[in-house]
Curated annotation (Swiss-Prot):
GO terms for cellular component: extracellular region. Residues 24-69, 103-129 have a biased composition (Acidic residues). Belongs to the aegyptin family. This is Simplagrin. Residues 166-177 have a biased composition (Low complexity). Monomeric in solution; likely has an elongated non-globular form. Interacts with human and rat collagens (via a RGQOGVMGF peptide, where O is hydroxyproline). It comes from Simulium nigrimanum (Black fly). Residues 1-20 form the signal peptide. InterPro entries: ALL3/gSG7_salivary-like_helix.
């Protein structure tokens, strides 16, 4: 009897135990597995997102660092360019200043040299003019002597005819209102005209002036009264100096390459001036 009770009790306990333990359900197991898989996928997805966020953050930081480096490099390059440009400008300014000083000093030295050369040329010109004056005076003396001899002969010839030559000879010996006096006065005026120029232009201008002198002397050789033609030479020297100064300026401008043209034009101006003198000189015969 006790055995049956124990067996029954064991059976009851077994039944209770079986009843209290959950019966495994396949659907619940599948649900749990799916939930676990979803949780694992969510965790993986979260890890991937976190990793992507980290990569993006790292890329952003890298780009920011690169931008800062580029900005710094550009700033340094600009600073170097500015420094270089300032240095170049300063160097150019210094070089320009030195060149300006050199040019100014060279111009001063050149001006000093030209002044010294002009003084020397002036001394040489003065000597040459003195020589030319001596030669012209000697020529003038010879011509005066020849004119006086011719006047004496004419006076003798005319004195034999009617005594007219004696009056002319007397006026010639007196040196006033005579052809000889007119000649001397005109020569004095013409010889007083000077050409201020440097060689080789000066000699060419003097040759052109010589045409004016010779032609003028030939036109007044028979004029008895110088007082009638004296006004014709009032501004002659001034006009010649204007023409000569213009010739010097033009020759200096072309640096001597146009000296032939300048000399020929000056001679033409002297010929024109002679033709302008002719009507005035004709008044001495009346």
């Amino acid at each position: 009897m006790k055995k049956f009770c124990l067996i029954f009790l064991l059976l009851a306990l077994t039944a209770l135990h079986v009843k209290g333990s959950p019966i495994p359900d396949e659907e619940s197991e599948e649900t749990e597995d799916a939930e676990q898989e979803e949780d694992a996928e969510e965790e993986e997805h979260a890890e991937e997102e976190a990793q992507e966020d980290g990569d993006q953050t790292q890329d952003t930081d890298q780009e920011s660092d690169d931008g800062q480096e580029e900005t710094a490099n550009q700033g340094s390059d600009e600073q170097q360019e500015e420094d270089g440009s300032h240095g170049t400008d300063e160097t150019d300014d210094e070089a320009a200043g030195s060149r300006t000083e050199d040019v100014e000093s060279g111009g001063d030295e050149q001006n000093d040299g030209e002044e010294n050369g002009s003084q020397e040329n002036g001394e040489e010109v003065t000597g040459g003019e003195d020589d030319s004056h001596g030669a012209q005076d000697s020529e003038g003396g010879e011509e005066d002597a020849a004119a006086q001899e011719a006047g004496g002969k004419k006076s003798k010839g005319k004195g034999a005819k009617g005594g007219q030559g004696s009056n002319r000879a007397g006026s010639s010996s007196g040196g006033e209102e005579s052809a000889a006096h007119t000649y001397q006065e005109v020569m004095r005026i013409l010889n007083g005209i000077k050409i201020n120029a440097k060689e080789p232009l000066k000699s060419r201008l003097v040759n052109g002036l010589q045409y004016l002198k010779v032609d003028t002397i030939n036109r007044v050789e028979n004029i008895q009264k110088f007082s009638r033609i004296e006004h014709c030479f009032g501004n002659l020297d001034h006009i010649v100096q204007l023409y000569a100064g213009d010739a010097v300026e033009r020759n200096d401008y072309c640096k001597g390459t146009c000296i032939d043209m300048v000399s020929n034009e000056f001679r033409g101006q002297m010929e024109e001036l002679t033709s302008r003198l002719y009507p005035c000189l004709q008044g001495g015969y009346y």
